[in-house]
Amino acid sequence: MKKLVVDGQRFLNEDGAQVILNGINLVCKDKAKGYVEPCDAALFAWFREQGFNVIRLGLIWDGVEPEPGVYDDAYLSRIKQQVVWAEQNDLYVFLDMHQDLYSVHYGDGAPAWATLSDDLPHVTGHIWSDAYLESPAVNRALDHFWRNTFASDGIGLQDHYAAMWKHAAQFMADCPNIIGYDMMNEPYPGTSGQEVLGTIIAAYAGHVMGIADPNMEQLAGLWFDEEKRLEVLAGMAEMDTYRILVDSAREVSQIFEREVLAPFFSKTAAAIRSVSPDGFLMLETSYFSNMGIESGLQLVQDPAGQTLHHQVFVPHGYDLVVDTEHYDIYNQDRVHLIFATHRKVQERLNVPVLVGEWGAFSNHPATFQLSRQIIAIFERYLWSNTYWCWCDGFKEAPYAKALNRAYPQATAGVLSAYRYDHDTGSLSIDFVSSVGETLIYHPHLESISRSDVAVAGTDAYQIELRPFPDSKSGILAITVPDQGNKITVTIGSDVKGTIATWQAYQ
């Protein structure tokens, strides 16, 4: 597979073509399954047919290091087999060290030996993630991790984590399709997360309820009451109000990113880069930025203060009703705000964005249109993404139909815009041409003929249709020999109209 590099806010392959990565999460959090999704090579072939070209592939710390300093290479071998299947189907992979609620005791992630909760109680809520805000055990265990408290062998928990990452990266070092390392899924601050929540509650009380001196415990109880939570969400539906709420918590959330997360990333990155010098460092935000709090994330630097190469911003984005069936109050304006905030961070960092998680949808019929709307955001920003997540029933889900779309996988030149219309099946792409092939995935390639393709901006071009074996989908390759031309490619129903519009514009 062609090697990828980071060039400013773009991914480029070794030919210099601009690459859009479009894929899915494959993460098994079930210890009974050995933390490996049961599947075979056929699933990866299907991923390719669906237009996916990247997988966020989950690792679990408990799977990699079940005892202090003892690594389970049999587990890593099973994961590696999936990486090989991905390569055989032209799928890039980045490894995600996944955790939810920090530990196998409460969710998934850290092994029991790395879970130091000081015997505090674990409390759960209506939604799994409520435990971040309610469980003393989860927060104490996270506090010990961020403090690098010694494990039973006298080695710090973070030091174990970095060494574990080094071992995993070295084990996978001969896999050419592994592009990077997502160092921790959704880092949560621990006890200081209560301060973030408290700041938001105080802002809500003041701006929505008109209470200047709120009873914080009483107000927090509104969020943890399933029925009253819906009333709180209604108060957060107005975007000016929601901006005030997320902005109120920005500084306290960013303190964690600057003072705790940044040195953790530096330590972990150094371990990974010692065995994978060019692997992408995939940087996530604090957990709270999933909801639109602006991240203060900084790029990783070496001990001399030099910014390391090949870093990628991999934020997540979910509306507040995620993991529920309340699609009637799903707020697309909040989603736009979340990703607009991530875009602001990208412009500050000047690195590519690959949205590591979004969606988490059920089979509700509304998820088709919701997915289309979110994908339109990614198209506008020219972002890469991996949908959360592969699961039983995925192929029949409404949202899966929205994920199966035409898009430019590799553009020979500088991509400026593209858009796919599910209603008409048409795709438009604007770019400034360079040497090489532009490779366009289309889910209905078998129905496309050369007369369905228009290339405006040059009279000299070549088109080749490359269907996938036994599939309706495939790749449409376009070669434009002229360099520096403003090119518009249209595939689908409005070819003649697009040419006329382009000529009038010129």
Annotate the PLM regions:
Residues 30-38, 64-65, 72-73, 189, ...:
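Acidic-and-aromatic substrate-binding clefts and catalytic sites of carbohydrate-active enzymes
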Residues 44-51, 172-173, 299-312, 343-350, ...:
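Acidic (Asp/Glu)-rich catalytic clusters
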Residues 22, 310-318, 324, 330-405:
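Substrate-binding cleft of secreted/luminal carbohydrate-active enzymes
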